[in-house]
Amino acid sequence: MRVAIAALAVSIIASFCYGQTDGNHPKETKRIAFENGQWFDGHAFKRKDGYAVNGILTFHRPAKVDETVDLEDQFVVPPFGEAHNHNVEPLNKVDELIRRYLEHGIFYVKNPNNLPSGRDQVAAKINRPESIDVTFSNGGFTVAGGHPAEIVKRNIDRGFWTEADGDGAFYYAIADEAELDRKWAQFLQTKPDFVKTYLLFSDDYKARKDDPKYYGWKGLDPALLVTIVQRAHAAGLRVSTHVEIAADFHAALVAGVDEINHMPGFRTSGDVKTHAMSEFEIADSEARAAARQGTYVVTTLGGAAAIDAKGPDASLRSESDKLNRRNLELLKKYHVKLALGSDSYRSDTVPEALYIESLHVFDNSDLLAMWCATTANTIFPKRLIGSLKEGYEASFLVLKANPLENFDAVQQITLRVKQGKILKADQSR
């Protein structure tokens, strides 16, 4: 059977099917030929035909083809990723959330801090061919009264959570190695996909540690982070670390973490103390260290776009853009692995990508590769995803226009394919 892509195109307001196949990999599926497409190779688009065979991408025509889709010279890219969002959890409207992620072409999501019980409640809806794929850290490691303890308090006050959802569930308060010894086994029993840790103004750790005025604005002793990283790596787990300022970025690198969550400057206010913009500037030596160690850095800069460039805070917007541009240019200089993550509960990485594009640090090809490949690789480092290569999972998006010429084309998705299955509108809704 041969069909044109126009006959398969899914409306951006449609609902997507998901949730009837067990496991993360599909059983035997149709052998589908995708002809007359322009396929992104990480740098440019090359015109060729691709095939999905049992959920795997190949560019060699199989002996038998069950269906042929004419891509009509449109542009094929890997799916997008979201390397930092806490919104895949039961307090959210999960069905609507999944629909929106798929609509936006985001197939892979990383949740770096969640309630283990919340993960259990959404498990049946995710990590299957017709849905999004998600990894979870479960509870994060911080100091008593440190971030994210204030989130637990807020949800208790709202009647959503109880005290049991705090220390030992959503987070683990750790003051020293003895306390880590007592709680580490409990944490591992939750079967995390990776480890989330927190550094907040770590150069001021001793002053903040026992002072209640810094509630929610403090994190781990940076010396203790070294031990956590060692234990995590011994258990086969990667470590992600929340940072606020450049001093935290430095401490995370010294500890040997695998991923830094947020670039310094993702927020420059809110703390008890006022901080100069210079405190958020990454040092040249730290950028070189991040590149040398292969550390992933998740951006989380899109919040700056909410500051009206022509409004009363125009100067703050200008300063934020200048800082973000400076740090991105430095990380780019040393080829640091940059992944996109929004940390925006009600949004995703589409605005994040558009904001970074507006800074004109990266050409469209590099930004697209960051969003598709690097982001996917830090979410699922052991899977063959994020690139349109022989033997990789047959997951991709088809765009109406060329995103290398106009990056806004990333919002013009005409077809979505995940593990060899064409995602279609749910006609029952």
State each model region's role.
Residues 4-15:
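Bacterial N-terminal signal peptides
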Residues 17-66, 401-406, 421:
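N-terminal metal-binding scaffold of metallo-dependent hydrolase/deaminase domains
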Residues 37, 55, 73, 84, ...:
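Divalent metal-coordination and catalytic microenvironments
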Residues 80, 95-212, 217-237, 285-306, ...:
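Divalent-metal coordination cores built from histidine and acidic residues
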Residues 87-90, 115-120, 200-206, 244-250, ...:
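Active-site environment of divalent metal-dependent phosphoester hydrolases
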Residues 209-322, 337-339, 377-379, 400:
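Active-site core of metal-dependent hydrolases
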Residues 319-402:
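His/Asp/Glu-enriched, well-ordered alpha-helical/loop segment
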